[in-house]
UniProtKB/Swiss-Prot annotation:
Catalytic residues (UniProt): K161 (proton acceptor)
Catalyzed chemical reaction(s): uridine(2552) in 23S rRNA + S-adenosyl-L-methionine = 2'-O-methyluridine(2552) in 23S rRNA + S-adenosyl-L-homocysteine + H(+)
Species of the source: Thioalkalivibrio sulfidiphilus (strain HL-EbGR7)
Any single GO CC term annotated in Swiss-Prot or TrEMBL for this entry: cytoplasm
The protein, known as: Ribosomal RNA large subunit methyltransferase E
Main function: Specifically methylates the uridine in position 2552 of 23S rRNA at the 2'-O position of the ribose in the fully assembled 50S ribosomal subunit.
Length: 207
């Protein structure tokens, strides 16, 4: 099947992308690592000894970066419905955490201590139709927020990918009721024409 003009354009942009080239040169699994790196430089979410849950982790760029910063006394639990190659010091929970068995495995790995940080870079497969894509994206963000409610320690932090559009404002308002401080970040590595942003929610409130 011949490729469409849009897919040709995407491929050209992908291989010309400075962040794709950097990721290849620096041994990271995806360009997405530079979004997290920029957020980290500004917000200092990741620290030595932390327990981190990474949702939508495959292929593992964020997981790699987080594991390097939490160090040998910290741990990263990576969750995705897609298979993911192992990484040193990382526990991978493969499967859909909406399913009870997968969620139980995830909770068992974390134990009673819970998590200091939940990160979600989850996004739906985009159709190009906003009326379809935006509800799917917000649904994934809701799932991530619900998991954060379950596993975060009091005072813990939550980082989540969002797309500006329907339900965005309501979601951010919800975060502000549950966390002490919420900021919106648009990393330079996020493609300019994308409506993708990240919400940084600090200090999970005790309910």
């Amino acid at each position: 099947m011949p490729r469409s003009k849009s897919s040709h354009r995407w491929l050209k942009e992908h291989f010309d992308d400075e962040y794709v080239k950097r990721a290849q040169q620096e041994g990271y699994r995806s360009r997405a690592v530079y979004k997290l790196q920029e957020i980290q430089e500004r917000d200092r979410l990741l620290r030595q000894g932390m327990t981190v849950v990474d949702l939508g982790a495959a292929p593992g760029g964020w997981t790699q970066y987080a594991a390097g910063l939490v160090g040998k006394h910290g741990r990263v639990v990576a969750s995705d419905i897609l298979p993911m190659d192992p990484l040193p010091g990382v526990t991978i929970v493969e499967g859909d955490f909406r399913e009870a068995e997968v969620l139980e495995r995830l909770l068992a790995v974390l134990g009673e201590g819970g998590a200091d940080l939940v990160m979600s870079d989850m996004a739906p497969n985009m159709s190009g139709m906003d009326a379809v894509d935006q509800p799917r994206a917000m649904y994934l963000a809701e799932l991530a927020a619900e998991l954060a409610r379950t596993v975060l320690k009091p005072g813990g932090d939550f980082l989540v990918k969002l797309f500006q559009g329907a339900e965005f404002d309501e979601y951010v308002r919800m975060l502000r009721t549950e966390y002490d401080k919420v900021s919106i970040r648009k990393p330079k590595a996020s493609r300019p024409r994308s409506r993708e942003v990240y919400a940084v929610a600090r200090g999970r409130k005790v309910v």
